[in-house]
């Protein structure tokens, strides 16, 4: 199938199921929490979670997997397990709902969605256009 072959071109490892349906709430909670306490570490987190899911076939819906990744990214000195667990048990759910509502308001219905200003571009096929527009200063 063309889509599978096209996606595989971008990956340095074989994929098993490109149509994998996974609950991402735990991973998203980790992202929101990390954005609040250590925004400089967000890129590392996103890369690790993608590798865990697509390369290593780890269940990222498991909160313990996300907790372990946060511990590794932040290190023992920076990771505050009580703060993380409090976030998950209390304000995290509200923060996640707000993020989902904001995405819906912005018209995000597809991943990935990129924004240049307020204009959305959906799908990696848009990357050449986005790059050209950025290079042209548009």
Predicted segments with their positions:
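Structural alpha/beta surface segment adjacent to cysteine/selenocysteine redox centers
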Residues: 1-56
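C-terminal cap of thioredoxin/glutaredoxin-like
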Residues: 48-138
């Amino acid at each position: 199938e063309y889509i599978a072959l096209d996606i595989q071109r971008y990956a340095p490892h074989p994929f098993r199921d490109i149509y994998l349906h996974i609950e991402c709430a735990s991973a998203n909670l980790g992202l929101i929490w990390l954005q609040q306490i250590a925004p400089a570490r967000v890129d590392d987190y996103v890369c690790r979670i993608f590798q865990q899911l697509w390369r290593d076939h780890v269940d990222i819906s498991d909160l313990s997997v996300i907790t372990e990744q946060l511990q590794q990214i932040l290190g023992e000195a920076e990771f505050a397990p009580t703060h993380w667990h409090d976030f998950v048990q209390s304000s995290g759910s509200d923060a996640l709902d707000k993020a989902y509502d904001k995405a819906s308001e912005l018209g995000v219905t597809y991943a990935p969605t990129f924004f240049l200003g307020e204009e959305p571009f959906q799908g990696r096929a848009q990357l050449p256009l986005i790059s050209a527009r950025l290079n042209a200063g548009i």
